Amino acid sequence: MDIHVLNHPLVDHKLTVLRDKNTPSSTFRELVSELVMLEAYEATRDIEVVDKPIETPVAPMIGKHIAAPAPIIVPVLRAGLGMLDGMTKMIPSAEVGFLGMKRDEENPTQQITYANRLPEDLTGRQCFLIDPMLATGGTLVAATHYLAERGAKDITAVCILGAPEGLKFVEENLDPSIKFKLVLCAVDEKLNDKCYIVPGLGDAGDRLYGVID
């Protein structure tokens, strides 16, 4: 498993404001989008490109163009939606699928799938899974398996925060035949007894969109 944790003062600054409990939802949403754009630079480092002949105002040249079929960005609902704008700004030619998963509160490593809007065949597609929090790792593993069942073999996960327990679970439960990369802004200390990341930032979905009882 290829893990990349961003090391940049701008990321550290924005992440500190994001974590602050006094940061309002409007600012929180803007910061998530900005952080994802910074992550996308690393996440797309190995994106497939092809030669493209063009003419500049001065001379013809061979440039680069994102290869077909187009990459697909898959936000894990609902918190992953907050990351979608940043990713599509960086890869505007990408298609977007949606995957609704939530943690089983009685068994945190098990997931409940409640929505799916994805192509049936993902063979040959580069997939970018986006979900702000990698806590237990259960959602990420389940989502990766879900894409792999549809033929995906090249998956990059983009998360803002991770916990050591989640990283360990992902590494132990991923299908080794999948080319998998994980990009994070930071890895925090641990999970608490409610499986929240510590120090973390709270519930990302609630902070993005407000609490839903």
Curated annotation (Swiss-Prot):
Residues that hold 5-phospho-alpha-D-ribose 1-diphosphate according to the record: 78, 103, 131-139, 203
EC number: 2.4.2.9
UniProt cofactor note: Binds 1 Mg(2+) ion per subunit. The magnesium is bound as Mg-PRPP.
Chain ranges passing through the membrane: none
SUPFAM superfamilies, per database record: PRTase-like (SSF53271)
Activity modulation comment: Allosterically activated by GTP.
InterPro entries: PRibTrfase_dom, PRTase-like, Upp_B, UPRTase/APRTase, Ura_phspho_trans
Cofactor(s) needed for function: Mg(2+)
Catalytic activity: UMP + diphosphate = 5-phospho-alpha-D-ribose 1-diphosphate + uracil
EC class name: transferase
Top-level taxonomic group: Bacteria
Annotated positions binding uracil: 197, 202-204
GO terms (BP aspect): UMP salvage; uracil salvage
An MF annotation (GO) of this entry: magnesium ion binding
Record's keyword annotation contains Disulfide bond: no
Pathway participation: Pyrimidine metabolism; UMP biosynthesis via salvage pathway; UMP from uracil: step 1/1
UniProt keywords, alphabetically: Allosteric enzyme, Glycosyltransferase, GTP-binding, Magnesium, Nucleotide-binding, Transferase
Function: Catalyzes the conversion of uracil and 5-phospho-alpha-D-ribose 1-diphosphate (PRPP) to UMP and diphosphate.
HAMAP family for the chain: Upp_B
Alphabetical list of PANTHER family matching this protein: ADENINE PHOSPHORIBOSYLTRANSFERASE (PTHR32315), URACIL PHOSPHORIBOSYLTRANSFERASE, CHLOROPLASTIC (PTHR32315:SF4)
Family, as annotated: Belongs to the UPRTase family.
Entry protein name: Uracil phosphoribosyltransferase
Native source organism of the sequence: Bifidobacterium adolescentis (strain ATCC 15703 / DSM 20083 / NCTC 11814 / E194a)
Record lineage: Bacteria, Bacillati, Actinomycetota, Actinomycetes, Bifidobacteriales
